[in-house]
Amino acid sequence: MANVALLQGKKVLVTGAARGLGRDFAQAFAEAGAEVVMADILSDLVQQEAQALQKQGLNVQAVTVDLANADSIENAVAKSVDVLQGLDGLVNCAALATNVGGKNMIDYDPELWDRVMNINVKGTWLISKACVPHLKQSAAGKIINVASDTALWGAPNLMAYVASKGAIVAMTRSMARELGQSNICVNTLSPGLTLVEATEYVPQERHDLYVNGRAIQRQQLPQDLNGTALYLLSDLSSFVTGQNIPVNGGFVFN
Protein backbone atom coordinates (compact mmCIF):
# COMPACT_ATOMS: atom_id res chain seq x y z
CA MET A 1 0.00 0.00 0.00
CA ALA A 2 1.36 3.41 -0.97
CA ASN A 3 1.63 6.32 1.44
CA VAL A 4 -2.01 7.38 1.63
CA ALA A 5 -1.18 11.04 2.18
CA LEU A 6 1.35 11.53 -0.61
CA LEU A 7 -1.16 12.41 -3.36
CA GLN A 8 -4.12 13.27 -1.17
CA GLY A 9 -6.53 15.49 -3.09
CA LYS A 10 -4.58 15.30 -6.36
CA LYS A 11 -6.48 14.80 -9.60
CA VAL A 12 -4.59 12.64 -12.09
CA LEU A 13 -5.14 11.38 -15.63
CA VAL A 14 -3.24 8.23 -16.65
CA THR A 15 -3.13 7.07 -20.27
CA GLY A 16 -2.48 3.47 -21.24
CA ALA A 17 -4.16 2.49 -17.99
CA ALA A 18 -6.04 -0.64 -19.04
CA ARG A 19 -3.04 -2.87 -18.37
CA GLY A 20 0.68 -2.98 -17.72
CA LEU A 21 2.49 -0.03 -16.22
CA GLY A 22 -0.45 2.34 -16.66
CA ARG A 23 -2.78 0.01 -14.77
CA ASP A 24 -0.28 -0.34 -11.94
CA PHE A 25 0.30 3.42 -11.83
CA ALA A 26 -3.43 4.11 -11.58
CA GLN A 27 -3.79 1.80 -8.60
CA ALA A 28 -0.71 3.20 -6.85
CA PHE A 29 -1.84 6.80 -7.31
CA ALA A 30 -5.34 6.04 -6.05
CA GLU A 31 -3.92 4.20 -3.04
CA ALA A 32 -1.86 7.31 -2.34
CA GLY A 33 -5.04 9.38 -2.14
CA ALA A 34 -5.43 10.69 -5.67
CA GLU A 35 -8.60 10.83 -7.73
CA VAL A 36 -7.68 9.04 -10.95
CA VAL A 37 -9.08 8.79 -14.45
CA MET A 38 -7.82 5.78 -16.37
CA ALA A 39 -7.70 6.34 -20.14
CA ASP A 40 -7.10 3.73 -22.82
CA ILE A 41 -8.10 2.73 -26.33
CA LEU A 42 -9.16 -0.65 -24.91
CA SER A 43 -12.57 0.61 -23.83
CA ASP A 44 -14.02 -2.54 -22.29
CA LEU A 45 -10.84 -3.52 -20.49
CA VAL A 46 -10.19 -0.10 -18.98
CA GLN A 47 -13.78 0.01 -17.71
CA GLN A 48 -13.37 -3.45 -16.18
CA GLU A 49 -10.10 -2.50 -14.49
CA ALA A 50 -11.59 0.73 -13.14
CA GLN A 51 -14.54 -1.20 -11.72
CA ALA A 52 -12.16 -3.69 -10.09
CA LEU A 53 -10.30 -0.84 -8.38
CA GLN A 54 -13.57 0.81 -7.36
CA LYS A 55 -14.50 -2.41 -5.57
CA GLN A 56 -11.31 -1.96 -3.55
CA GLY A 57 -12.61 1.43 -2.44
CA LEU A 58 -10.37 3.45 -4.74
CA ASN A 59 -11.50 6.67 -6.43
CA VAL A 60 -11.05 5.87 -10.11
CA GLN A 61 -13.03 6.38 -13.30
CA ALA A 62 -12.38 5.33 -16.90
CA VAL A 63 -12.53 7.02 -20.30
CA THR A 64 -11.70 5.91 -23.81
CA VAL A 65 -8.94 7.61 -25.75
CA ASP A 66 -7.28 6.98 -29.12
CA LEU A 67 -3.94 8.79 -29.28
CA ALA A 68 -4.01 8.58 -33.07
CA ASN A 69 -7.17 10.71 -33.16
CA ALA A 70 -7.08 14.38 -32.15
CA ASP A 71 -10.84 14.57 -31.54
CA SER A 72 -10.72 11.51 -29.29
CA ILE A 73 -7.92 13.13 -27.30
CA GLU A 74 -9.82 16.39 -26.83
CA ASN A 75 -12.97 14.54 -25.80
CA ALA A 76 -11.13 12.30 -23.34
CA VAL A 77 -9.41 15.23 -21.65
CA ALA A 78 -12.64 17.23 -21.45
CA LYS A 79 -14.48 14.28 -19.91
CA SER A 80 -11.63 13.59 -17.47
CA VAL A 81 -11.48 17.18 -16.27
CA ASP A 82 -15.25 17.22 -15.89
CA VAL A 83 -15.18 14.03 -13.80
CA LEU A 84 -12.25 15.17 -11.69
CA GLN A 85 -13.32 18.82 -11.48
CA GLY A 86 -9.79 19.89 -12.32
CA LEU A 87 -6.41 18.37 -13.12
CA ASP A 88 -3.14 18.27 -11.21
CA GLY A 89 -1.24 15.56 -13.03
CA LEU A 90 -0.94 13.79 -16.37
CA VAL A 91 0.93 10.51 -16.80
CA ASN A 92 1.57 9.67 -20.45
CA CYS A 93 2.00 5.91 -20.36
CA ALA A 94 0.12 4.94 -23.53
CA ALA A 95 2.33 3.81 -26.40
CA LEU A 96 2.49 1.41 -29.30
CA ALA A 97 4.95 -1.11 -27.88
CA THR A 98 3.75 -4.59 -28.81
CA ASN A 99 5.16 -6.32 -31.90
CA VAL A 100 7.12 -3.25 -33.01
CA GLY A 101 10.54 -4.92 -32.94
CA GLY A 102 12.41 -7.90 -34.30
CA LYS A 103 13.57 -6.38 -37.59
CA ASN A 104 16.66 -4.38 -38.39
CA MET A 105 16.65 -0.86 -39.78
CA ILE A 106 16.96 -2.09 -43.37
CA ASP A 107 13.87 -4.28 -43.21
CA TYR A 108 11.71 -2.11 -40.96
CA ASP A 109 8.21 -1.36 -42.29
CA PRO A 110 7.82 2.39 -43.04
CA GLU A 111 4.09 2.25 -42.27
CA LEU A 112 4.77 0.74 -38.85
CA TRP A 113 7.39 3.45 -38.26
CA ASP A 114 4.75 6.10 -38.95
CA ARG A 115 2.21 4.44 -36.63
CA VAL A 116 4.71 4.24 -33.79
CA MET A 117 5.70 7.89 -34.18
CA ASN A 118 2.11 9.05 -34.57
CA ILE A 119 0.96 7.41 -31.35
CA ASN A 120 4.05 7.53 -29.16
CA VAL A 121 5.27 11.03 -30.00
CA LYS A 122 2.50 13.04 -31.63
CA GLY A 123 -0.17 11.51 -29.41
CA THR A 124 1.82 12.33 -26.28
CA TRP A 125 2.24 15.91 -27.45
CA LEU A 126 -1.45 16.33 -28.33
CA ILE A 127 -2.80 15.03 -25.04
CA SER A 128 -0.26 17.08 -23.10
CA LYS A 129 -1.31 20.13 -25.10
CA ALA A 130 -4.97 19.48 -24.29
CA CYS A 131 -4.19 19.14 -20.58
CA VAL A 132 -1.97 22.22 -20.20
CA PRO A 133 -4.78 24.79 -19.78
CA HIS A 134 -6.16 22.71 -16.92
CA LEU A 135 -2.76 22.02 -15.35
CA LYS A 136 -2.15 25.76 -15.30
CA GLN A 137 -5.08 26.08 -12.92
CA SER A 138 -3.39 23.71 -10.49
CA ALA A 139 -1.12 25.09 -7.81
CA ALA A 140 1.62 22.79 -9.12
CA GLY A 141 0.84 20.84 -12.29
CA LYS A 142 2.86 17.73 -13.12
CA ILE A 143 3.43 15.78 -16.32
CA ILE A 144 5.23 12.45 -16.40
CA ASN A 145 6.16 11.14 -19.84
CA VAL A 146 7.02 7.45 -19.80
CA ALA A 147 9.93 6.78 -22.14
CA SER A 148 12.28 3.77 -22.10
CA ASP A 149 15.89 3.03 -21.34
CA THR A 150 16.13 1.53 -24.84
CA ALA A 151 16.66 5.10 -26.03
CA LEU A 152 19.62 5.44 -23.66
CA TRP A 153 21.57 2.37 -24.77
CA GLY A 154 20.38 2.13 -28.38
CA ALA A 155 18.55 -1.19 -28.37
CA PRO A 156 18.94 -2.89 -31.77
CA ASN A 157 16.13 -4.25 -33.95
CA LEU A 158 13.64 -1.90 -32.30
CA MET A 159 14.35 1.28 -34.20
CA ALA A 160 10.98 3.05 -34.37
CA TYR A 161 10.22 2.42 -30.71
CA VAL A 162 13.71 3.50 -29.63
CA ALA A 163 13.50 6.63 -31.77
CA SER A 164 10.05 7.48 -30.42
CA LYS A 165 11.21 7.17 -26.82
CA GLY A 166 14.30 9.25 -27.53
CA ALA A 167 11.97 11.88 -28.93
CA ILE A 168 9.91 11.73 -25.73
CA VAL A 169 13.01 12.46 -23.64
CA ALA A 170 13.90 15.46 -25.82
CA MET A 171 10.32 16.69 -26.04
CA THR A 172 10.04 16.54 -22.25
CA ARG A 173 12.94 18.95 -21.89
CA SER A 174 11.41 21.39 -24.35
CA MET A 175 8.04 21.15 -22.62
CA ALA A 176 9.70 21.76 -19.25
CA ARG A 177 11.29 24.97 -20.55
CA GLU A 178 7.98 26.25 -21.92
CA LEU A 179 5.74 25.26 -19.02
CA GLY A 180 8.00 26.19 -16.12
CA GLN A 181 6.64 29.72 -16.13
CA SER A 182 3.26 28.19 -15.26
CA ASN A 183 4.82 26.15 -12.44
CA ILE A 184 4.22 22.91 -14.34
CA CYS A 185 6.94 20.30 -13.87
CA VAL A 186 7.57 17.91 -16.77
CA ASN A 187 9.79 14.87 -16.33
CA THR A 188 10.53 11.58 -18.04
CA LEU A 189 10.49 8.16 -16.44
CA SER A 190 12.50 5.56 -18.37
CA PRO A 191 11.81 1.95 -17.38
CA GLY A 192 13.94 -0.98 -18.34
CA LEU A 193 12.45 -4.13 -19.85
CA THR A 194 9.49 -4.79 -17.57
CA LEU A 195 7.33 -7.90 -17.24
CA VAL A 196 4.03 -6.68 -18.68
CA GLU A 197 1.72 -7.77 -21.50
CA ALA A 198 3.43 -5.48 -24.01
CA THR A 199 6.79 -7.22 -23.57
CA GLU A 200 5.58 -10.81 -23.82
CA TYR A 201 6.78 -10.95 -27.44
CA VAL A 202 10.33 -9.93 -26.52
CA PRO A 203 12.82 -12.80 -27.08
CA GLN A 204 14.20 -14.54 -24.00
CA GLU A 205 17.74 -13.53 -24.91
CA ARG A 206 16.78 -9.86 -24.56
CA HIS A 207 15.27 -10.56 -21.13
CA ASP A 208 18.48 -12.36 -20.17
CA LEU A 209 20.57 -9.44 -21.43
CA TYR A 210 18.74 -7.10 -19.09
CA VAL A 211 18.82 -9.35 -16.04
CA ASN A 212 22.51 -10.16 -16.42
CA GLY A 213 23.43 -6.55 -17.19
CA ARG A 214 21.65 -4.97 -14.24
CA ALA A 215 23.35 -3.97 -11.04
CA ILE A 216 20.30 -5.50 -9.33
CA GLN A 217 20.10 -8.78 -11.21
CA ARG A 218 16.44 -9.74 -11.42
CA GLN A 219 13.43 -9.18 -13.64
CA GLN A 220 11.81 -5.75 -13.47
CA LEU A 221 8.18 -5.62 -12.31
CA PRO A 222 5.62 -2.83 -12.82
CA GLN A 223 5.59 -1.95 -9.13
CA ASP A 224 9.31 -1.16 -9.30
CA LEU A 225 8.36 2.13 -10.96
CA ASN A 226 5.60 3.23 -8.62
CA GLY A 227 7.77 4.97 -6.05
CA THR A 228 9.48 7.20 -8.60
CA ALA A 229 6.18 8.02 -10.30
CA LEU A 230 4.58 8.91 -6.96
CA TYR A 231 7.51 11.18 -6.17
CA LEU A 232 7.30 12.96 -9.53
CA LEU A 233 3.56 13.59 -9.09
CA SER A 234 3.83 14.74 -5.50
CA ASP A 235 4.78 18.08 -3.97
CA LEU A 236 8.13 16.54 -3.01
CA SER A 237 9.34 17.11 -6.60
CA SER A 238 8.12 20.70 -6.96
CA PHE A 239 11.57 21.93 -8.09
CA VAL A 240 12.40 18.97 -10.35
CA THR A 241 11.69 19.45 -14.05
CA GLY A 242 13.15 18.52 -17.42
CA GLN A 243 14.79 15.41 -15.98
CA ASN A 244 14.95 11.85 -17.25
CA ILE A 245 14.99 9.26 -14.49
CA PRO A 246 15.92 5.72 -15.57
CA VAL A 247 14.35 3.09 -13.32
CA ASN A 248 15.92 -0.14 -14.53
CA GLY A 249 17.88 -1.74 -11.72
CA GLY A 250 21.10 -0.20 -12.93
CA PHE A 251 21.13 -1.51 -16.51
CA VAL A 252 21.81 2.04 -17.73
CA PHE A 253 23.24 4.74 -15.49
CA ASN A 254 22.40 8.42 -15.91
Residue locations for each model-derived region?
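Alpha-helical segment proximal to the catalytic Tyr-Lys
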Residues: 133, 177-181, 238
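C-terminal helical subdomain
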Residues: 188, 211-236, 240, 249
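Canonical Rossmann dinucleotide-binding motif of NAD(H)/NADP(H)-dependent dehydrogenases/reductases
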Residues: 4-37, 175
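Short C-terminal tail/terminal secondary-structure segment
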Residues: 2-3, 97, 102, 153, ...
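Residue(s) in the substrate-gating loop at a strand-loop-helix junction
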Residues: 148
